[in-house]
């Protein structure tokens, strides 16, 4: 798998970057302290890596690029997914549109099991970065493609995910109401 500068692709996106998350747990060593704090009910410490990502989102949104994400979750929500819901607030504060879709409620989401970021699908230079994870949820590699068939497949997955996603704030309110 070739090296892919994912943050660089966000920086150069002109119209849209769409992230689909399908994993129920991501093993990201850099998140360990934040996750531990969340699990213990303490405030999550700042993380320079997250701060850098949020700055990239703010800059993209400021130049008119739409940044969106949908996480397809399974019920019951595990502790990691509850952590993600809390951590996403930082993303929305930076201007990213975050949606949540429940796989059990929408059978057509069952086939969506591969993470990716789709860049500028309607633009002159569309591309998709497929994100490969191992069984533990660790990122195993990134694969970039600008092949029309790959972009079209990712765009169809994006449409399915967006059709069933609920905005983060609405989902959290519904989840808290029980």
Label the predicted regions.
Residues 27-29, 77-80, 138:
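Short catalytic/ligand-binding loop motif for oxyanion handling, primarily in non-cytosolic enzymes
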Residues 59-60, 91, 161:
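Hydrophobic helix-cap positions at the C-terminus of alpha-helices
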